From Swiss-Prot:
Protein name: Rhazimal reductase 1
Temperature dependence of activity: Optimum temperature is 37 degrees Celsius.
Cited function: Oxidoreductase involved in the biosynthesis of akuammilan monoterpene indole alkaloids (MIAs) natural products, components with various biological properties such as antidiabetic, antibacterial, anti-inflammatory, anticancer, and antimalarial activities. Catalyzes the conversion of rhazimal to rhazimol.
Signal peptide segment: none
Annotated NADP(+) binding sites: 53, 167-168, 189, 215-220, 289-297
Subunit text: Monomer.
Keywords: Alkaloid metabolism, NADP, Oxidoreductase
A single GO molecular function term of this UniProt record: oxidoreductase activity
Organism per entry: Alstonia scholaris
Length: 323
């Protein structure tokens, strides 16, 4: 049997354990054919990944479900319980009456009885059937933070999601949610990397015992929509050279040292191994201080959800000024 990576776990506030590195399944259009995509995910399973992160908006739930089923059928893993599968409900389903049916649809897409973690993708609601990222004023609808969370709690109570969480929530939106929550979010999955270090949100979530997972830890370097701001950052390049590590390893180790987990996507088998070789070495205080001085800028502003006459009138409203 080929060598497998070993990834540590964290216990969430729900009592369930989650591997600290998730394999991301968001792929650029055109999405590869189902069997090809399932084969890539199966390769990641062979490498040792067990935490897989998807979303209804990615169009990859079925392929991931196929890979999980094949891994179980072929004896690559002992059973479903070896996996930690997370998915996110899109904005068109961010309504009290739509969340449960949407989660059931996700489970049907993947051929699963439950998710390990179900999240609300954005604190935003759009009209059902609206063209994604081409929203009109009429498509943008009021979002009920507390009502949608009650529906998530019902999914948890029914056993359809062992843990429930959110994505892209600010401190202020989490505070509003928690005012009326019976079950607190286990996870807040947010943009986090060395050029957007979440200096306000991270300590807030730690105080509330909500685990932070970083998406875009390398700013999607190499993708059409990506940026070189992390991978070509001169401070990281210098640290990587001095430690005989890759820039990606330094950037990912930094996230781990902040107490956060991260979602990584690569179809390159060598990088599947390389990206998790970060747990047996440390950054020095001097190196951490240098990273702390990197200028900060949020990469994703969410302008698609903004309209001067809509529920969210500015990016400042969406992120509650944390820009």
């Amino acid at each position: 049997m080929e060598k497998q990576v070993q990834i540590p776990e964290i216990e969430l506030n729900s009592g369930h354990k989650m591997p600290l590195v998730g394999f991301g399944t968001c792929v650029p259009d055109p999405i590869p054919p189902l069997e090809e995509l399932a084969g890539i995910f199966l390769e990641a399973i062979k490498v040792g990944y067990r935490h897989f992160d998807t979303a209804s908006s990615y169009g990859t739930e079925e392929a991931l479900g196929r890979a999980v089923a094949q891994a179980i059928e072929t004896g690559l893993v002992n059973g479903r319980e070896e996996f930690f599968i997370s998915s996110k409900l899109w904005c068109e389903d961010a309504d009290l009456d739509l969340i449960l049916p949407a989660l059931k649809k996700t489970l049907g897409n993947m051929g699963l009885d439950y998710l390990d973690l179900s999240m609300i993708h954005m604190p935003v609601r759009v009209r059902k059937g609206a063209e994604m990222f081409n929203y009109t004023k009429e498509d943008l609808l009021p979002f009920d933070i507390q009502g949608t969370w009650k529906a998530m709690e019902e999914c948890n109570k029914l056993g359809l999601a062992k843990s429930i969480g959110v994505s892209n929530y600010s401190c202020e939106k989490l505070t509003k949610l928690l005012e009326n929550a019976t079950v607190p979010p286990a996870v807040n999955q947010v943009e986090m990397n060395v050029v957007w270090q979440q200096r306000k949100l991270l300590p807030f979530c730690k105080e509330k015992n909500i685990h932070v997972t970083a998406w875009s830890p390398l700013l999607s370097y190499g993708a059409v929509w990506g940026s070189n701001a992390v991978m070509e950052n001169p401070i990281l390049v210098e640290i990587a050279a001095s430690k005989n590590k890759t820039v990606a390893q330094v950037a990912l180790r930094w996230i781990y040292e902040q107490g956060a987990s991260f979602i990584m996507r690569t179809f390159n088998k060598d990088r599947m191994f390389e990206n998790v070789q970060i747990f047996d070495w440390e950054l020095t205080k001097e190196e951490l201080d240098k990273i702390q001085k990197i200028p900060q800028r949020r990469g994703t502003l969410g302008e698609d959800f903004i309209h001067p006459e809509g529920p969210i009138k500015s990016v400042e409203d969406l992120w509650d000024g944390d820009l």
